[in-house]
């Protein structure tokens, strides 16, 4: 509403101001559209935490329009079974990725190639059976890795190379039977390791990993449980409680197998020796060198009863020695106290007994005076 008596100049000024305000409002709206990225369909986005939540939507593919500035991407509880190598391309700012509770059976080698700032990776409860050794080489800042509840039977050597910042690793509920110590050597910052609910075979193949576990526990690392499944004598027993002498046979077995392959030079051994040629009539057959392969000794697990018996015998011997030392010390103390008491009583009796030689000299002096 114009004030009464306003002229055309005042009207034109008001119209001009109104146009300026409209232009400024439109410009702000356009800037807001450019700054705030579009959110993928059916997903929930938080512009403050830069989190995109696409969990529980029944997705079979990763949404292609995830904003490049996303720092947290949640894709758990979906139906993802196969992912292309470019599924997370251009998401270099991503720090947290959750792919739990899906149907993934394998991961392309370069699927995490652009995730250089990734610090947390959740792959729990999938169907992953194998992992490429270079899968995590482009994520050196990774701190938390969860591979539990999958079908992993082994870990490729070099899988954890370069993961110096990794603090927690979960390998629970897989099909792991043994682990290589060299695979875990690069994990200098590891604080928590979960390996429970795996069919561990506590034999020679797990000896070196047991050494690494002792070092890991010594520097303050936490381990849930590593219960043996085989051999049956150790079933249910924690690997850390198995005495090291149970693995003494492993070194002997390796030495015997190595020496079997370093015998005197001769023809190469074969599994089935060829039939000797038929001798000529009237000629004596010449003995031929044996080409049979020496049979390697199979690993025979040391009896748990024998190991426990050795420990018990050693404890009994040590106990007897300690008891003998205590008895000897007590006997010495008693003997010393008795001797001290005897000397005290002897000193008390000496003034009462008198000196017979002194009395004899006194009698001589008296007789000479008389």
Curated annotation (Swiss-Prot):
As recorded in Swiss-Prot or TrEMBL, the protein's gene is named Lrtm2
Q: Where in the cell is it found?
A: Membrane
Q: Which residues form the LRRCT domain?
A: 198-252
Q: Give the Pfam families listed for this entry.
A: LRR_8 (PF13855), LRRNT (PF01462)
Record SUPFAM superfamilies: L domain-like
Q: Which UniProt keywords apply?
A: Glycoprotein, Leucine-rich repeat, Membrane, Repeat, Signal, Transmembrane, Transmembrane helix
The record's GO CC annotations read:
membrane
Q: Which Gene3D superfamilies match?
A: Ribonuclease Inhibitor
Q: Which residues are glycosylated?
A: 90, 117, 125, 257
The residue intervals holding the LRR repeats read 69-90, 93-114, 117-138, 141-162, 165-186
Q: What is this protein called?
A: Leucine-rich repeat and transmembrane domain-containing protein 2
Q: Which residues form the signal peptide?
A: 1-35
InterPro entries, from UniProt? Cys-rich_flank_reg_C (IPR000483), Leu-rich_rpt (IPR001611), Leu-rich_rpt_typical-subtyp (IPR003591), LRR_dom_sf (IPR032675), LRR_TM_domain-containing (IPR050541), LRRNT (IPR000372)
**Topology with regard to the membrane?**
Single-pass type I membrane protein
Domain LRRNT, first and last residues per copy: 36-68
Transmembrane segments annotated in the record for this chain: 307-327
Q: Region (Disordered) spans which residues? A: 260-297, 351-370
Main localization of the protein? membrane
Taxonomically, the superkingdom here is: Eukaryota
User: Which segments sit on the Extracellular face?
Assistant: 36-306
